[in-house]
């Protein structure tokens, strides 16, 4: 087992009584980090449904690289990766969760077939901290991020996710953070606050696939309305990571079924304690 963050080989106190879940969260606007929104409340509530994890492995839409990278920092920085149009209060947010260099090294070994490498330049982007600050406000759960390799098709992302699945047996929470429906031009140009019909239609199609037909999800670009509902591959692909980290026999629990113009906030969990 991995040692405490930054201490190679040291024993980590194990708190595991249950296999950690695999989650997908629709993270939406960075403002969810500092506002009392239905989605933020949903993230806080879902964290109460299972034991606090020993660590989190996060795949965020906001870290795209050539090659698979794994954060190795003992103390990852809080990255404010959004424009200056947001309020200063958002730039003031710090989420000082520790990293876990030992877990990072183990992940690189586990993902050898995919050419994974350690990276000490990245930190925690807003696809990560805007969500987990509601789940674990004390910032006391170590986090390691795994990047999205821009060179790989969806089927290979699914294979990478499958390689991460057994981490859950060590009470390590696997999270994909993106959005099933993510079309920012459609959000900004919407004539009203009501979501377009295709937002719910496409979201419901993918929800059905998450529950019953993973092939439909992995082949998401071939589904009706994909070109308008899911034009941003990096926001959809984290769905595939939660999907691939599922264990046989697990059924999804859906929450945060909120729709906005061009955006769905749907989230789901596999493996919640019964």
Locate predicted features.
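A short aromatic-anchored loop/beta-hairpin motif
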Residues: 14-114
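Short, basic/glycine-rich phosphate-binding loops at helix/coil junctions
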Residues: 23-24, 82-88, 136-144, 216-218
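Flexible, glycine/proline-enriched loop segments at strand-loop-helix junctions
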Residues: 90-98, 120, 147-154, 226
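Surface-exposed, charge/polar-rich loops and edge strands
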Residues: 109, 113, 141-143, 150-152, ...
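Internal, conserved structured core segments that host functional sites
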Residues: 104-156
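Beta-strand elements within well-structured catalytic alpha/beta cores of enzymes
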Residues: 21-25, 55-60, 146, 167-180, ...
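Short, Lys/Arg-enriched N-terminal segments with co-localized hydrophobic residues
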Residues: 6-15
């Amino acid at each position: 087992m991995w040692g405490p963050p930054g201490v190679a080989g040291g024993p980590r106190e194990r708190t595991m009584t249950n296999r950690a879940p695999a989650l997908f969260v629709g993270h939406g606007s960075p403002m969810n980090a500092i506002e009392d929104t239905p989605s933020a409340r949903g993230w806080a509530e879902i964290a109460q449904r299972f034991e606090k994890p020993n660590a989190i492995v996060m795949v965020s839409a906001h870290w795209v690289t050539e090659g698979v990278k794994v954060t190795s920092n003992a103390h990852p920085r809080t990255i404010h990766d959004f424009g200056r149009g947001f309020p200063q209060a958002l730039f003031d947010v710090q989420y000082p969760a520790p990293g876990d260099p030992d877990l990072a090294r183990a992940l690189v070994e586990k993902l050898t077939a995919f050419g994974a490498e350690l990276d000490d330049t990245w930190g925690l982007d807003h696809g990560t901290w805007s969500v987990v600050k509601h789940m674990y406000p004390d910032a006391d759960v170590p986090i390691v991020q795994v990047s999205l390799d821009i060179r790989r098709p969806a089927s290979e992302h699914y294979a990478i996710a499958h390689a991460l699945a057994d981490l859950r047996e060590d009470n390590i929470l696997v999270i994909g953070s993106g959005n099933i429906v993510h079309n920012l031009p459609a959000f900004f140009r919407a004539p009203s606050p009501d979501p377009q019909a295709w937002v719910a239609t496409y979201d419901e199609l993918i929800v059905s696939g998450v529950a019953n037909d993973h092939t439909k999800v992995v082949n998401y670009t071939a589904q009706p309305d994909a070109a308008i509902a899911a034009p941003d591959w990096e926001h959809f692909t984290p769905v595939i990571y939660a999907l691939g980290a599922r264990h046989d026999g697990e059924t999804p629990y859906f929450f945060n079924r909120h729709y906005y113009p061009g955006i769905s906030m749907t989230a789901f969990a596999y493996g919640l304690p019964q």
